[in-house]
């Protein structure tokens, strides 16, 4: 583990449009608001939170490859249903991860029901809007603190 525990937050394509893109599915919070709230919560817990959002798959993969995080929180967005490469990046670095989705992907179009990540994630949170990120952060912090006590 790094000297200060670290979480990498990864947000996939189109999440830069949060707050104005289909608010019925994704809510009214902007990505900036979500990330700012998460950083504040992480700092209070003594955790460094690094963030990347990109519409480019290769940039997300490189961020994962280059990370020394203890945990990853990922909203792969549309890559959820298509990206073996992003899945392989997470498996390749062997950093535990939590998958998050703002909307309930299981109540939407059938193509959104399959995830290339869920079977490898330590947990999946979907349908709870921006609050789902906070739940994922709290779970990640708890796992990091438990690992610190053990080792």
Swiss-Prot record:
EC class (word): lyase
Higher taxonomy: Bacteria, Pseudomonadati, Pseudomonadota, Gammaproteobacteria, Alteromonadales
Organism encoding this protein: Shewanella halifaxensis (strain HAW-EB4)
Protein name: 3-dehydroquinate dehydratase
Positions marked as site (Transition state stabilizer): 21
Keywords, comma-separated and alphabetical: Amino-acid biosynthesis, Aromatic amino acid biosynthesis, Lyase
Catalytic activity: 3-dehydroquinate = 3-dehydroshikimate + H2O
Record EC number: 4.2.1.10
Binding locations of substrate: 75, 81, 88, 102-103, 112
Pathway: Metabolic intermediate biosynthesis; chorismate biosynthesis; chorismate from D-erythrose 4-phosphate and phosphoenolpyruvate: step 3/7
Assembly and binders: Homododecamer.
Protein role: Catalyzes a trans-dehydration via an enolate intermediate.
Molecular function GO labels: 3-dehydroquinate dehydratase activity
Biological processes, Gene Ontology terms: amino acid biosynthetic process; aromatic amino acid family biosynthetic process; chorismate biosynthetic process; quinate catabolic process
Similarity field: Belongs to the type-II 3-dehydroquinase family.
Active-site feature positions: 26 (proton acceptor), 101 (proton donor)
Domain of life: Bacteria
């Amino acid at each position: 583990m790094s000297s200060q525990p670290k979480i990498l937050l990864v947000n996939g394509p189109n999440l830069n449009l949060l707050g104005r893109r289909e608010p019925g599915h994704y809510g009214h919070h902007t990505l900036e608001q979500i990330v700012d709230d998460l950083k504040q919560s992480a700092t209070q817990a003594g955790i460094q939170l690094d963030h990347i959002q990109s519409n480019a798959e290769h940039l997300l993969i490189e961020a994962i490859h280059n990370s020394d995080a203890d945990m990853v929180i990922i909203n792969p967005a549309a890559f959820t249903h298509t990206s073996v490469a992003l899945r392989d990046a997470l498996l390749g670095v062997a950093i535990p991860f939590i998958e998050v989705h703002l909307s309930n992907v299981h109540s939407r179009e059938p193509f959104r029901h399959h995830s290339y990540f869920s079977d490898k994630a330590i947990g999946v949170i979907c349908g709870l809007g921006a609050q789902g990120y906070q739940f994922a952060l709290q779970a990640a912090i708890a796992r990091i603190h438990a690992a610190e006590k053990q080792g």
